[in-house]
Amino acid sequence: MKLNIFASAILLCTSAFPVAASRLDKPYTEVYRPQYHFSPKENWMNDPNGLVYDTDEGIYHIYFQYNPGGTTWGAMSWGHATSRDLMHWTEHPVALRARGFPDNITEMFFSGTVVVDESNTSGFGRKGKVPWVAIYTSYYPMEQVLPSGKRVRKDQQAQSIAYSLDKGMTWTTYDAANPVIAEPPAPYHDQHLEFRDPSVFWHVETSRWVAVVSLAKLHKILIYTSQDLKQWDWVSEFGPANAVGGVWECPSIFPLTLDGSQQDKWVLMLGLNPGGPPGTIGSGTQYIVGDFNGTTFTADADSIYDGSGPNDGMIFEDFEGDESLAARGWATTGDFINASPVRGTLSGQNAVTGFQGQQLFNTFLNGDATTGAITSAPFDITYKYINFLVGGGNDINETAIRLNVNGKTVHASTGSNDEHLTWQSWDVSSLKGQRAVIEIIDNASDGWGHINVDQICFSNTRATNQIANWLDWGPDFYAALSFNGLDRDQRTILAWMNNWQYGAAIPTDPWRSAMTVPRRLALKTIDGKPSLVQQPAGRWRTSGNHGREFSFRAVDGVRPLGRLGKALDIELTFSSNMSPSNGLGEFGVSIAATKGYQYGTRVGYDFATQQVFVDRSRSGDVSFDATFPGVYHAPLSNSANGTISLRILLDWSSVEVFGAHGEATITSQIFPGPDAVYGQLFSSGGQTRDVSLQVREIQSTWH
């Protein structure tokens, strides 16, 4: 749960796109209203909270961060909804309303968990009724003495509990003793403003309740145990590890079997804000695989990253030292004649991060107006991979690093319109023995008209651009939480489908924010290490049993598909054996596109980098925040059978992509125009073969 005050100014849409829905519209038919994702009837929503499955009644309960008084963050309370199938939802009255709402708020209810206390360890049960217990963060906006007699400071965050004797429909706060964890333990007393988001479960082997709570700014998770949910003992901590670009929030920990065997591993999920996946701006969710003994979480070595890149092979260029580019053996043109590597961020540039050592090649010398190129001395290709760090502009024709063989470009890469440098790799195994040069070009002079490059190295190991295991590589997946009460092999999560960067500005009304589709998790060995995979858990009603099917022996260029619809379940498979010209090749489908295809969302696969991508740069209304348009990538290796498969879930204002078995996912909001119901296939850089496409139109779950 993030304490965040958004800027109140929201840019209006241009006339090309619909303005926010009118409150006079029929509920759940408003412009951009999700048709099969949960969203509240009205007002602001963020983190999912207290997800629990009632095994007796067969009902899923979701609680969520909710503002009962408006469409921006504030007056944090717990909303509530239920479903029997994870698809059709009934919204209920607010479960935990901010104390003193609306005019004299003394306590807000931040994120937390609900557990079913079957053995009545808490003692809250009465007359045979099993208590449900909510464990949440209390946020106190003012110094005060509580009904329990405990004194809290202004803006303090502490952990409290409430209980329900009617299966989660109404709640009683434990005012006699709240908060039950008033402050962080002694070493961290000064962190009482950043101590939040308890996730609680019953640990069978030790017969104890376990809670994980975030020390947000320190990138630490505190682990507590309890026998009764009232008295808690701090037993260990974990962190920092992997991604630490922003605060850690919304932690949770749970077991999964590895590869469907009897071997258990434990997964720690963590929200990060900002500092999400490469190419995104704002929040994201990472995970770490390891072991848990009831008190201590120990990460697997292969689940932790140091970001240093491969340690074999040779460094071709690290841009360190005092020599000019020409003195280092680079041929220079344009503004790069007499230029030298630079020490990080230049005047007028956003912070440049992710490079190694003290220096890098940064073409922002005189701002984006700088143009030119540098070309390395020729070299023989003797290793399997060429690895490098790259950031900056995302224009393959204007701002790129290229590999040229015999005067032809065989590989090229760019940044992601982001100043953070990430690892990219070219597989040059088929080019061994040939002579090549590396060229870095900057022919662009407008926004993002620059490129950052560092640490070019030759290796037999592909570099990873990962600093973390990302649960989702898109910009709109945060605060993921799993349901308590389900069997281990049914581990199911929801996440907030929005981003703190622009969440209060998205053009929706009278509600703001939706949840992702529910996703079933599994743990599988991929590329030699345990990795989370996820698949949609719902079965939505579609138009017809098979929908529309397309089959093409080969696609080259574009192939219009006609009118497809606004809410779709798409399955796309194609051969991974494309031989792209000039080292460049993409295949995919444009969806939610206008009739003339001036606007649309591109979902596809980059054969050169082996990445699935979502491009929402021209998806519709992107005017409300400068960081909203973008292209997002997730690594997806070729399959053993030589095919790539993508499942794409399109709703009225979102797209979720699941690559292969679900090891690569991208979640992205979009806000297309009213006529954006068309689609077309695209193949650039060569032919894509053996294309199969199935499109089913999903019916609304609200009507």
From Swiss-Prot:
Its EC number is 3.2.1.-. InterPro entries: ConA-like_dom_sf, Glyco_hydro_32, Glyco_hydro_32_AS, Glyco_hydro_32_C, Glyco_hydro_32_N, Glyco_hydro_beta-prop_sf. One of its GO terms (cellular component) is cytoplasm. The active site is at 47. Glycans are attached at residues 104, 120, 293, 397, 443, 641. One of its GO terms (molecular function) is sucrose alpha-glucosidase activity. GO terms for biological process: sucrose catabolic process. It is an enzyme of class 3 (hydrolase). CDD domains: GH32_Inu-like. Residues 1-21 form the signal peptide. Keywords: Glycoprotein, Glycosidase, Hydrolase, Signal. The keyword Membrane does not apply. The keyword Cytoplasm does not apply. Belongs to the glycosyl hydrolase 32 family. PANTHER family: EXOINULINASE INUD (AFU_ORTHOLOGUE AFUA_5G00480) (PTHR42800:SF1). This is Putative glycosyl hydrolase ecdE.
